[in-house]
Amino acid sequence: MDIGILSSLKPAQSFRDNSLGSFINSIDYSDSGEYVATTCSADDTVQIYDALDPKQVHTITCFETGIEVARFTHHDHNLLLSTTKGNKDIQYVSIYDNKRISYFSGHTDIVSSIEVSPIEDQFVSTANDKTLKLWKMNQSSRCLGNLDLPSLGIPAYDPTGLVFAVACHSLSRIFLYDVRNYGSDPFSTFTIDDSRYLSRFSFPPMMPEWKHMEFSNDGKCILLSTRANVHYILDAFSGDVLSRLEDFQELPFSNNFHGGSTTFVPQGNFVIGSADDRTLNVWNLRHTFHHKGKTRPPEHRIVSQSIINPGLVKYNPRYDQLLTAGSQLVFWLPEKYALTS
């Protein structure tokens, strides 16, 4: 992957299967990179798309339970869905026959995040009840572990699947846990302090609200996305701020988005993220460990009149394809493959 390919990304296909005036809440790729799932809370629907030949292929209606977040399991035709009505279960759903396989009960408020282990049929969930729960997909009767958090948590697995992290913005801390010893205290805690930089904008300095967290494919870095015009690349072993990814646009997106306005590009040392209404930024992370604390402006900006409010961004784990979502869903391809601009 190089900047030439990323800078040539063009909208190839767009969809608006959600109602007029509504926004897509969450997006996810299947492990194979062949399918996409989106949710729209306003419509109580989950849409499934073929990613390789972009088209809508299935709709799951959730009128009785509501819908917040959808995440693929390790099977292309199975999803985990968080509900907004009733007892706030997580549902394990078969897309193929639209059946609920099992229910994961325990959260007392809406589940805001679901992250699936990269190596096994296990997942973590965080909810507005300020808890994190660890689950086995074949054991829905009770969770494997429960953590009480000081505030809403943002979870992420490292690429080995042996560690999960949970970020708590209210404390400006990230806690790291050993999956094999989840009942113990975190084995590492990072306090994220960028007061010197942030004091340029407010006093006392205010850390922008955190929105999303993910590990790089090599496990060395953590991407911490915020709701403001700066995001962070952290050392995954020390918590040090390696880079600030700076933009000069405030992001006026809905508080109901579940995901990040930035994401790692799996095949290279780049981060791509949304900027203003019709713009994406590309940051180059080259020499990140040699220039710690460096503020990085975007190396390239992608502007297209075909996108509106790209509040969610996700890169295909298997193919050179980007997904953005806001009031519409857009599939992006390098220019030589894109059908439209």
Swiss-Prot record:
It is found in: Cytoplasm; Nucleus. Keywords: Cytoplasm, Nucleus, Repeat, WD repeat. GO terms for cellular component: chromatin; cytosol; DPS complex; mRNA cleavage and polyadenylation specificity factor complex; nucleus. This is Uncharacterized WD repeat-containing protein C824.04. WD repeats lie at residues 19-59, 106-145, 252-293, 303-341. One of its GO terms (biological process) is regulation of pericentric heterochromatin formation. The keyword Transferase does not apply. GO terms for molecular function: chromatin binding. PROSITE patterns: WD_REPEATS_1, WD_REPEATS_2, WD_REPEATS_REGION. The keyword Nucleus applies.
